Amino acid sequence: MTIYLCIAFNMVNTYIDYLRLRKYWKILNQIKKHREEIKQLTNNCLKIKTTEFKKRIKSGISLDQILPETFAVASEAAERVLGLNPYDVQMIGGIVLHEGKIAEMKTGEGKSLAASFPAYLNALTEKGVHIITVNDYLARRDYESIGKIFEFLGMKVGLINQYTPISKRKNNYLADITYVTNSEIGFDYLRDNMATQIKELTQRPFHFCIIDEVDSILIDESRTPLIISGRTKTRKDKYELAHRLANFLKKSIHYKIDEKNRTIILSDLGVITCEKILKIKSIYSAQNTWAHFIYNALKAKELYLKNVHYIVRDQQAIIVDEFTGRIMPERRWADGLHQSIEAKENLQIKEETKTLASITYQNLFLLYLKISGMTGTAKTEENELISIYSLPVICIPTYKSMIRKDLPDLIFQTEIEKLKAVTEECVKMHLLGRPILVGTTNIQKSEILSQLLNQYQIRHNLLNAKPQNVKRESEIIAQAGRKYAVTISTNMAGRGTDIILGGNLEYIIKNKITSLFKPIILTGNTQYIIIDKSLKSSGNEIRDINSNILKIINLHRQNPKLTIAEFGNSLNIASKKIKSNNEYILNLRSIYIIFENIYKKYFDIESKEVKNIGGLCVIGTERHESRRIDNQLRGRSGRQGDVGSSIFFISLEDNLLRIFGGERISKMMHTFMPSVNEPIQSPLLSRSLDSAQKKVESLHYNFRKQLFQYDQILNSQRKAIYLERRLILESNEIVAWTMAYMELTIIDILNDQYLYSHRKPRDKVLKNINKIYDLLASPISLIKIEKYTFNKKTILKQLKISYDLKKAQIDKTSCGLMKSLERSLILEQIDTNWSEHIQQMSFLKEFIGWRGYAQKDPLIEYKNESYILFIKMIRTIRQNILYLLFRAEPTLDFS
């Protein structure tokens, strides 16, 4: 019954997508009509169209009204500049992006070009468009190629990556369209909200963004906040002792492991044992807490494994991203977990950090007025994307029909039998000459499989997060579609890689040309380069290559400081056939075209041979916890209508089945399996596995949703504090802010006297008031305060007099010094106390869950407690400003 309901549900979804797409086909026909008219325009007239569109928008025309015409202009520019005539499906993808939705476009369907059309349209508002990518390489690649379309149409294009200096960031953010990575835009946002001078600000208000690999950023990365941190004291001895203690404790006796929620639960015996060994009364004591260190040490021991969750390189524990398989050297686990792993691996324990500013990607991208995104896999997560970001997913049809065969899973009883079967399948496919991509879930398993293939003497490439393999990533992926190629990879090959049957011709040619010129660039020796004698080409082609090489050598003599990176950028432009008047690029292009003519015929022959034997064979060695990650692996095969196949080899010992599969699946498999060595291939079991994955996805979604609900409370406070901070930074009337803070402080203290005297001892309130009078240099003493009738006007009047005296005193040292002092003091107090507040909120969130045992809603409790903490922080900021400002003493220079 459940299966039939799933089929019916999928049919309904397919029909809804059809109805949505029908609307886009109508708009597409309008675009085509405009395109026919625009083809007649000269390049200059096409460029003038941008100015015309801007005027029409200012006159009140909506973006939707001019969409067909702007898309026609941008598509015509793409053909003239890049020689790319957009497919209909790319135009439809662009319309979907403009509407603030997610376009699900499969591998090789041209997402970068599709994004150019809505980017151009929305940039006409002159409020800026950000195209967000997941790494620097993709940002630069699209900036250098697709960016030429915008420049041709008279728009300014910016690029921001980790190497962009602060001095250039502001101008790049002010560009009409800016290519930037998700991490850079997040850290720039945080840095802007820690700036102490207006000139340090880099960003303008967020308007519209197009996020590439949107599911990776908004779902996979959503749990990981961006953090700017400062150093704090670290109790290294506690981490080391906790590690030794964790090694002594025994699983199932002293503690239990909850693998579903990835947590450790200490038993009563475990708690008593820890307290006895440490010679303390309680590991949960607030004065000398040990619980935090013990739990982290046990997590490091049981849940965080070397070569699975992290690698050790150069005496450092480096995180491996579970979704991409890549290392993240700049990131560290928070709350002391990373220090516990360092203690476990006997590495130097680095200092703990204190959070100065933080934000999640969820809340960062919700700052935009309009968000859209593109990816090859998002439909399975549509409910989450709609509920949190209001982003529906529209599946864009492929340009060519998908003919890849996705075979039912092969299921084994044991891990060993499964890996043997994978190896045998690789041998079988290899004998046929089919290229094979084997996807594994972590480094450890990829290396085991590599050893098994070595036993069969099968040559293969290994791609995982280890440095020696990462260096060869581009080369491995470029060759992965060639005949007889066998590639074993972690999730590194699951996203953003384009495996071309027969091999990647562009990569090979670029590599050849780079190797020709590398000696010149590195040594500066501009002697004649000898062409590879194995090059199969005519004498005329050799002469043409040599002629262009000589021209480039002469240009190198004029610019001897050219770097490999700069040469690579020029070669990228040359290979893309982008129009250029640069003599250096034109000569490189001539060489590229000659090499292309020589090698293309050989690659075409091999491509045809690979297609005839079945295309790329993708083998998954384990189902991931998310169907989306599995689909990304499958999507490496069958690009742009190519033949191919995918199959998953699974065992009962895999984490998904062991932790989440349940007894039902296990019983089904034992019933169906004839023997330990014989696998099962059953659509019914495959659907049961899908069901298990959905359970895990639901679990993770609920966890992310809960995090989002908690983070929204902190986010509302962040918005309030950052808004006030920005107003102070930009204010010309800083005196008004100072007086407001000081007046509110006095009013708070007076309210304490009148309203809360029953809660606070009277002598404490009187002491606070007496401090104010001391600061204001008032003759009223504590004795007089007892008989004094508090009059707000009198005190505030005294405040104004005292402030004027202090200002005159400080400005004697340097004219305008008081104003600078006030601004820096207020900003410093906001930053310091906000950082403390973040720490307190983190502790609150960590322990608020225990309120559930008292039949209280932890979220409501968190909201109430956080409000009290926020008000307390605001009062502390104001009070500190009052006290510090009146205590400030100028240093006079009598020299």
UniProtKB/Swiss-Prot annotation:
It is an enzyme of class 7 (translocase). It holds the Pfam family SecA_SW. One of its GO terms (cellular component) is chloroplast thylakoid membrane. SMART domains: SecA_DEAD, SecA_PP_bind. Keywords: ATP-binding, Chloroplast, Membrane, Nucleotide-binding, Plastid, Protein transport, Thylakoid, Translocase, Translocation, Transport. Its EC number is 7.4.2.8. GO terms for molecular function: ATP binding; protein-exporting ATPase activity. InterPro entries: Helicase_ATP-bd, P-loop_NTPase, SecA, SecA_CS, SecA_DEAD, SecA_motor_DEAD, SecA_preprotein_X-link_dom, SecA_SF2_C. One of its GO terms (biological process) is intracellular protein transmembrane transport. Belongs to the SecA family. HAMAP family: SecA (MF_01382). Has a central role in coupling the hydrolysis of ATP to the transfer of proteins across the thylakoid membrane. NCBIfam families: PRK12904.1, secA. This is Protein translocase subunit SecA. It comes from Cyanidium caldarium (Red alga).
